[in-house]
Amino acid sequence: MKKIKAIFYIICVVFGLMTASCVDDDSFTTSASDVLSFSVDTLSLDTTFSNVPTPTKTMWVYNRAGKGIRCQSVRLESGNQNGFRVNVDGTYLGQTSGFQTQDVEIRKGDSIRVFVELTSKLQHTDAPNLVEDNLIFLLESGVQQKVNLNAYSWDAEFLKDKIIAKGVNEVFSNQGK
């Protein structure tokens, strides 16, 4: 009988400790004063040629608030009209998702990673063009935060099946033609 009482007390103590140690990490704030922090305010990609993808750049989105923050949506402001491709915490902002993701949760003290690359469209100009868009984070509190995405793009003329000839007046010639 004493063993049963001892086991019962041990079970009660263990259960009590487990219940008391539970942390409420599932609470989310709707306060407009709780906002996200970003590793950069502008994500600049390398200068690129039109129709040639840039290397992927990344940024971090931090939640330094005392509670979790839920983003109602994360989207490209232009709806991907400029050629940016974005992945937010593993979700690609593609055509099937309407170039946005919804209900992104960032727990208190946690962060998510955003991956960005660009394949700019042909601009039909001789000068470099600034390609820009904004990544919009709409928080559950109604606060909207933006991160600017930009890169310069040059139109290039790609010469295929051409060789540079040495000592010939014609600089470019067709191979075997």
Pin down the residues of each PLM region:
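Bacterial N-terminal signal peptides that target proteins for export
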Residues: 1-11
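Surface-exposed binding patches on compact interaction domains or structured appendages
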Residues: 23-44, 54, 64-122
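Terminal connector regions
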Residues: 23, 122-155
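C-terminal motif of bacterial Sec signal peptides marking the signal peptidase cleavage site
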Residues: 18-21
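Hydrophobic beta-strand core residues of beta-sandwich domains
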Residues: 49, 104-107, 174-177
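Intrinsic-disorder/low-complexity, polar/charged segments enriched in Ser/Thr/Lys/Arg/Asp/Glu/Gln
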Residues: 54-58, 111-113, 144-148
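Low-complexity, Pro/Ser/Thr- and charge-rich linker/hinge segments at domain boundaries
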Residues: 147-175
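Hydrophobic beta-strand positions in extracellular immunoglobulin-like domains
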Residues: 60-61, 118, 137
